[in-house]
Amino acid sequence: MKKLQIILITGCLFIIASCNSKKDAGGMSATAKKNLEAMHGITKCFDSKDFSKLGDFIAEDGIDHAGEQGDIKGLANMKAEFTKMVAAYDDSKTEVIKELADDEYVMTWQRYSGTMKIEQMGMKPGDKFNMSAIEVSKFKDGKAVEHWTFMEPAEMMKMMGTPPPPPMEDKMGPAKDSTSK
């Protein structure tokens, strides 16, 4: 009986010891933390409207799939496009709602607000905007190599002054359990 207790206690101690994570606090690897810091750096470039350090966070041959006219290829083209973009608005602010990172991707749910300086996307100078988006960036060697933006269509339409379509009519009615009688 004592032998069995010793085996059980040893087994429990082994399980407890094996559950002890060797990762840094926060559960992220060093690579994931580096990727998240790079994403924070990119966000700071937009908030400050200063893209001189963008090359510290984005690869030379990076691709932004969220350009107004389609893919933006290369760091130099991104800097030019981003500079043009931020010139269209004032008092912009980015709020991070939630962020997730691993060794390959960083995903951030962000809220953007500001005031338009020029007429663009159906908005006039002085119009306020407030929108949210999911930003997804793929990283390699600590730099973003690809980026996508996902936005709620109804929120975009509202921001652009276009009313969203009415909700779809429920033609199916409530769901029924076909297995019960």
Where are these regions (language model features)?
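Positively charged n-region of N-terminal signal peptides that target proteins for export
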Residues: 1-5
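Bacterial N-terminal signal peptides
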Residues: 7-16
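Short, low-complexity N-terminal intrinsically disordered segments enriched in polar/charged residues
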Residues: 19-56, 60, 163-179
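Hydrophobic pocket/interface hotspot
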Residues: 39-42, 53-55, 62, 74, ...
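A solvent-exposed, acidic/Ser-Thr-rich amphipathic alpha-helical stretch
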Residues: 51-103
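A mature extracytoplasmic/lumenal domain signature
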Residues: 100, 111-114, 151
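Exposed beta-sheet edge and beta->alpha loop/turn motif
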Residues: 111-141
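Short beta-strand edge/turn micro-motifs at domain boundaries
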Residues: 130-160
